[in-house]
Amino acid sequence: MNIIEQLEQEEIARLGKTVPDFAPGDTVVVQVKVKEGNRERLQAYEGVVIAKRNRGLNSAFTVRKISAGEGVERTFQTYSPLVASVEVKRRGDVRRAKLYYLRERSGKSARIKEKLPARKASVAAE
């Protein structure tokens, strides 16, 4: 590990931010800090993760949602101070790392199958 990576790891540890494990296809709710005038509030942004960029301190993810019939995408820096929290609502079962093909789709074709938890072997044997 070179010195830059080491400094980034130290900075991530110093921030102490716990980010849940999520992957493209998952539906997440991102709580974003929004400043309006002199007051600050949290705004929820719920959508499907279509891309994830793992680069240590520079990690980012893109969330897509449909707002008033229009597709809206927003990219968040994972360790940004503006991102208060990330909550996984639903796990999606996809076979791609980047889901950019969802941009051209609408309606039922844009749906993502839900990933169901694996059944135990004892249940399958019965």
Curated annotation (Swiss-Prot):
GO terms for molecular function: structural constituent of ribosome. GO terms for biological process: translation. Gene3D superfamilies: 2.30.30.790. It comes from the Bacteria. Keywords: Ribonucleoprotein, Ribosomal protein. The keyword Cell division does not apply. One of its GO terms (cellular component) is cytosolic large ribosomal subunit. InterPro entries: Ribosomal_bL19 (IPR001857), Ribosomal_bL19_CS (IPR018257), Ribosomal_bL19_sf (IPR038657), Translation_prot_SH3-like_sf (IPR008991). Belongs to the bacterial ribosomal protein bL19 family. This protein is located at the 30S-50S ribosomal subunit interface and may play a role in the structure and function of the aminoacyl-tRNA binding site. This is Large ribosomal subunit protein bL19. It comes from Thiobacillus denitrificans (strain ATCC 25259 / T1). The gene is rplS.
